[in-house]
Amino acid sequence: MAGNSLVLPIVLWGRKAPTHCISSILLTDDGGTIVTGCHDGQICLWDVSVELEVNPRALLFGHTASITCLSKACASGDKRYTVSASANGEMCLWDVNDGRCIEFTKLACTHTGIQFYQFSVGNQQEGRLLCHGHYPEILVVDATSLEVLYSLVSKISPDWISSMSIIRSQRTQEDTVVALSVTGILKVWIVTSEMSGMQDTEPIFEEESKPIYCQNCQSISFCAFTQRSLLVVCSKYWRVFDAGDYSLLCSGPSENGQTWTGGDFVSADKVIIWTENGQSYIYKLPASCLPASDSFRSDVGKAVENLIPPVQHSLLDQKDKELVICPPVTRFFYGCKEYLHKLLIQGDSSGRLNIWNIADIAEKQEADEGLKMTTCISLQEAFDKLKPCPAGIIDQLSVIPNSNEPLKVTASVYIPAHGRLVCGREDGSIIIVPATQTAIVQLLQGEHMLRRGWPPHRTLRGHRNKVTCLLYPHQVSARYDQRYLISGGVDFSVIIWDIFSGEMKHIFCVHGGEITQLLVPPENCSARVQHCICSVASDHSVGLLSLREKKCIMLASRHLFPIQVIKWRPSDDYLVVGCTDGSVYVWQMDTGALDRCAMGITAVEILNACDEAVPAAVDSLSHPAVNLKQAMTRRSLAALKNMAHHKLQTLATNLLASEASDKGNLPKYSHNSLMVQAIKTNLTDPDIHVLFFDVEALIIQLLTEEASRPNTALISPENLQKASGSSDKGGSFLTGKRAAVLFQQVKETIKENIKEHLLDEEEDEEEARRQSREDSDPEYRASKSKPLTLLEYNLTMDTAKLFMSCLHAWGLNEVLDEVCLDRLGMLKPHCTVSFGLLSRGGHMSLMLPGYNQAAGKLLHAKAEVGRKLPAAEGVGKGTYTVSRAVTTQHLLSIISLANTLMSMTNATFIGDHMKKGPTRPPRPGTPDLSKARDSPPPSSNIVQGQIKQAAAPVVSARSDADHSGSDSASPALPTCFLVNEGWSQLAAMHCVMLPDLLGLERFRPPLLEMLARRWQDRCLEVREAAQALLLAELRRIEQAGRKETIDTWAPYLPQYMDHVISPGVTAEAMQTMAAAPDASGPEAKVQEEEHDLVDDDITAGCLSSVPQMKKISTSYEERRKQATAIVLLGVIGAEFGAEIEPPKLLTRPRSSSQIPEGFGLTSGGSNYSLARHTCKALTYLLLQPPSPKLPPHSTIRRTATDLIGRGFTVWEPYMDVSAVLMGLLELCADAEKQLANITMGLPLSPAADSARSARHALSLIATARPPAFITTIAKEVHRHTALAANTQSQQSIHTTTLARAKGEILRVIEILIEKMPTDVVDLLVEVMDIIMYCLEGSLVKKKGLQECFPAICRFYMVSYYERSHRIAVGARHGSVALYDIRTGKCQTIHGHKGPITAVSFAPDGRYLATYSNTDSHISFWQMNTSLLGSIGMLNSAPQLRCIKTYQVPPVQPASPGSHNALKLARLIWTSNRNVILMAHDGKEHRFMV
C-alpha cells in the first residue's frame, strides 16, 4: 500500500490492554491532555477533564526504542505539538489533537532531556528545542523542522549534561541556560534573540563555569514564583541556590536512605521532592531562601551542616501499592494563565497514572497526614470499564469454558489473496477464518450474532503449547507452494500445514528452544536454499528447513548470545548471523560450516557488506526502521512485529537501502483493499489486530468487478435467493447434491483454462473424494467442509460493507439510517469503532477503545455543552467529533466509496451469505485459488489472461444450474434505482449536511490543506470527493473564513521570478536555475521518501528556484506548505475569485462580495498582487520543463493545469496566454493515444491523467474566454505558417506542439461552436484559419468540408464549393474571405458595410452570393472561371467582381439576444442563376443573376 493512497486503520484491541511501562510524562499547556511515553516506544495520549477525570484516548506508534523524553514543541494556542525522543536517537513531532506525526528525524545521539524555548523575532514567535543527553553539549533544534541549528558548547571540562533549566529574565533581553554536568559543574550560557538568526555558525561557549559539588544531579528547576532561586535535586540530597550568583541557600538530606529522583517549586516557599519508590515530600523552605523576607541570604557562606534545615510539610503516597518492575516516573506541572491546577502526576510500569492536586494543600495540615490522591487509572482499568468489552479479532471462536477471558492470540498472518486470517493461540491451536467476516462479527450488529461459531472456520491442532510465529511463504515469494503455511511454537517444533486440506504435512524438531522467528531467504540464493525457510530459536540456533525435501539442511547453533539479526550473502552462499553482544558469525549455507566469527568494527563491516549485496535488508529480525509503511508495501508483514518489539539499534542505512529497492520491485496495483496486521506493544502481549483499508484499492476492485460483470438479466439477486435453497449448519450453504453438481461444473470450466498454472492434480482427486463423501455423510461434511467455499461470499463487497458501516455517522438522520440498513444492507456498529490515522513515514495513531467517553467533558469552552449529551449517543458519530485530520480522512473515504457504489449496478450489501446465497455471480477461481481479482501475484499476467477467458463459461454454468431450480425473472429496475438513490443521499449527507446535523461546537471540520493535497489524487473517485469537500467547506466558512484562509497561507506562496516563464528562456538556463544544492544526510532521506508520501511529488517543483531571503528550509513540511499554499490559493482564486461573465455582457457590474480580498482587479488601489503571485506560481509549474525534481506528469503540474483552467478569468490579466495554451496543448497532444488504452477501474497512468486534465482545462479556458482562445491560437497558427514558409526551419515544423495537437484544437473549436456560436461568428475568419491549418488539405479535397468538420458548416456565413475546393467565409466587418484549399492561399473581398449574414456558392461555382442584414444588401460576385484560374496555374488568385447588388428589406430577429441573430436568413440556389433569400420566419425573396 503506497503512501500515496488513502489508508484507514481500524483496530481490534482485545480485552487485555497493551503493556505500557511509562518512562516519561508530559501535561500539555492547557491541561487537557497527558502524554506518556513507554519503554516499548509507544506514546499514549490521555484526555483530562476539568474534574481531573482521565481517559486514555490514543496510542501512537512510530518509535522503535524506549522513549527517553517528551517536551511541548509549540506555544500558539490552537496547535498542540509535542516532541518525543527515543533511546536510539529518533525524534518525532506529534500533533496531540489527532496523533499525526508532523515531522521526524534520526540523530546519532540519545537525548535524555528536551526543553522548549520560545522567543519573538519581530512580531513572529519562534520555537527552539534545547536538547541534552549522552553527548557533551546542548543541541539547539528548530521546533518545527527538527533541524539542528547550532550547539551550546563548554570550553572548560566539557562533559555530558545531566539536567538543564532555562531562566527567563524579565529585565533584559537575555535569557540564560543553566545546566549541571555529570561531574557537578554548573554551566551558564546566555541566549539572546539575535541568536535566532544563527544557523550552522560556530558554537556558543559558556559564560560561566563553576563547580558546585552536586554529584548525581537528577533535576534542576528555576523558581517561577520568585524568579530568584534554583532547586537542584541529587540522589542523596537536594539544595536551593540563589540564581544571581549561585551561592547555596539551603540543603535537605534524603529521608531514611531513599534516593531522590526529582523535584520542583510548588510555591515561593515550598518545594516538592520525590523518590524512586514513588513517594513525594513537600518541604517548607526557611526564610533565608525567600527574597521577600528580611533574612534572605543570611546563611550564605555557612557550611552545609550549619544551614537552617527545611521543615517537612506533608507526604504524598499511594495507599495500596502494586508491585512494579521499574521505578515510577513522577513530574510536577503547574498551570498557565487559564489553567490553575498544580498537579503531581506519576506513571508506573503497569500503565497506571496517579494524580495529586496540590493546589488545595491547607497550610495547617500536619506533616504526618498524607494528601489524598485525586485520580488513579490504568490502561487495563479503562478497558475493563467498557461495556461491551473491547473485542479481539476471533473472540467469538476462542471461548474457554468456565472462564470469562477468551484464549489469547499469540501469532497471526493474513493471506490477502484468499482474504483469510490465520491466528495461532496460546493453547497451540491455529484458526483459519475469513477476515472480513470475523471483523463484522466483532464490530457490527446483525444476524450473525445469533449463530455460534460464526463465521465458518477451520482449526489446525498440532502444537502442544503457545504458537509463537506463523509464516505464509507464498505471500513473500511466489516460488513457494501456495498451500503451505508454516508455524513455530514454544514446543521447539516447526510444522508445515496444507491450508486447503487442513492436514499437517511435516514436523521439524531440530531446535532446542522456542521458535522466535521464521524468515524467507532472498530470491538469488542457490536452488536448494530457495525452497527452504529459515527458523530462529531462543537456544541461539538458526535452521534452514527445506519444504521440498522435508528436512533440515543446515543448523547453525554455536552462538553464545541471543540472535539479533540475520543477513544473507547469496553470491558467496553465506548466511550471516549477528548476536546481541555485537559478534557476527558467517556460515556457509550448503556445507553448514562456520566460515568465521568476528567482533567489533569488522563485525559491523560484514553486516554492512551484506546490506550492499542485498539492497533490501528485508529479513533482519531487528530492523527497527522497518516501519509500518515499509512492512505494508512489502506485504511481507513479518517485518512489522520487529518494529513493534525488537528494541535494537541498526544502522539508518538499512532504511534507505530498503526504501530504494522497494520502489523498483513492487508490481503496480497489487494492493489489497484490506490488510490485517497483528502488532504487539511488548513481546509478552497477545496480538492486537489492525485492519488497514486501502480506499483506492477497494474502489479499483469494485470498478474492476463491475466492468467484468456479465449481463444482469442472467442472474439477478432474486433468482439467486430463490435458487439457493435453505442454509444448513455446515460451512456449505447450498444443499448437498446440487452444490456438488454445480461445483463440479464450475470446476471443470476453470480447470480447462488454468490447469497448468494453478491447480494441482493430486489435490483435485482429493477434492472429488471428499465431495462424494460429503454428499453421503453430513457429519463428515460439517467437520471437514472447506473454510470458505466458492459460493459463499464476495471479499470485495464484504470489505466495503464492513468499512462503510464503520464510517457512516449513525444516529444523525433516522430516515437515512433506515435506508442504509434496509436498502443498502449496511450494519450498525455495536460500540464506537476504534479508528487509526496513518501519517508520514508509517507513523500511526490508534484510538483506544472508549476514546469518546470523556470527549464530551473535555476542558474547553465546550465543557458545558458536552455535559448535556445523553450517554448512549456516542456510538457512530464519534469519529467526526474527534479531530480535523480524522474527519478529513473519513469523509474522503465514505464519499468516494458511496460515489463508486452509486455508479455500479444495484450495489447493495443485502443478500449476501447471511441471507441465502450471494448477490453476485460467482467469481472465477476455485475456493483454493488465489482469487485473481484480489491480488494477482506479480508473475501471473499470463494466468490473469486465462482467468478472464474463464469468466464467461463459469457464469453460464452457474446460471444454468440456478435456472433449473427457479423461474427466471428479470431484475427489478426500481430496486436498482432506489439503491443508487440511497448511496447518493449518503454521500450528500456527509459532504454537506454534517456540520448542521452535528452542531458546529462538536463537528471538527475537515482540514483544508489535506483536501488541497488530494485535489488531483490519482484515484478519480477520491479526487472528486476531495474537490467536492473542499469547495463545500470553503462555502461553509463564507467570505470571512476564506479571507482568513488566504491570510494564513499567503506567506507560504513561493515567489517565482517572472522571467522564468517567458518563452525566450532556454531550457538549459531553467535547468541551472532549478538545480538544487546536493542533497546529503537528512535531506537525502527526505527525497528518498518523497515518492512514497501522501502527496507524491506535489512538493517537487516548489522550492527549486525560489529566491528567498531566509535560508531555504529543506524541511519536508516547509516544502509541503508551499505546495499546499499554491493549491489552496489557486482554488479560492479560481472558484471565488470572479464570476465568469457570459459573453457580451461585460458591462454588468461585479458585486464586491464575490471576490475574496486580493483576488480582484479593482481600480480602488486594492492589492491584487496575490492573484498575480498565485498565477505566476501556477504558470511556472505548468511551463517548467521536466526535470528530476518536477517530472513531466507530476501531481503538482496536473493540479496547476486544473486550476489554470478553472480560474482562467481571474488569472488572465497576469499570464502569457499564448505560453499557457501552448503548454496545455503540449500536455494533451497525444491525449487520444493515452486515453485509448486505459483499463476500466484502474487509475489512469500519470501521462493519461495529465492529458485528461489539460484537455479539460483547455475546454474551460475556451468556453470562459472564447475570443482570447481563438485569437491566441490563430496568432500561433499564423506564426507557424510563416515559419513553415521559411525553408530553413522546415525539419522541425512537424514536431512542434501545434502540429501535434491539431486534433485537440479541433475538438475545442467544436465545443465552442456548440456552446458559444456567437463568439465563434465574431471571429469566424480566425476560426477558419485555425480549422484550415488543422485539417489535412488532401482529406478535405477528397471528402469535402461537410464530412471533415461538419460543425462549421452549420453557419450560414460559410459555404464550400467542392469542384474548385474553395471556401467562402463571411466576417463581422463586412468582408468575405475566400480560401483555396489547393494552394492554401486566402483572399479577402470587401462589399458590405455590416456583418455578413449568409454566403453561398452557385451550383456551378460561377457565382458567389453574399448577404448582409445590417446594410440590407445582397451582392453577386462572379468567380473567374478562366481555364488558367480554375486549374490554379501560376497560383493566380481568382479575379472577383461584383456584378449585381440588390436592396432587400431587413429581416427582424424573432427575439432580442440569443443565437437568433446567427440564423436570420440563408441563401438557397435553386438553379445555376436563381437564388432564394429565405428569412427565419419563412419569408422568401427571389433573385436572378
From Swiss-Prot:
The modification Phosphoserine is found at S935, S1455. SMART domains: WD40 (SM00320). It holds the Pfam family WDR72_alpha-sol. Residues 767-782 have a biased composition (Basic and acidic residues). It comes from the Eukaryota. Residues 754-783, 911-947 are annotated as: Disordered. GO terms for biological process: hematopoietic progenitor cell differentiation. WD repeats lie at residues 17-56, 62-104, 156-199, 324-366, 404-443, 462-507, 558-597, 1350-1389, 1391-1431. Keywords: Phosphoprotein, Repeat, WD repeat. GO terms for cellular component: synaptic vesicle. This is WD repeat-containing protein 7. It comes from Mus musculus (Mouse).
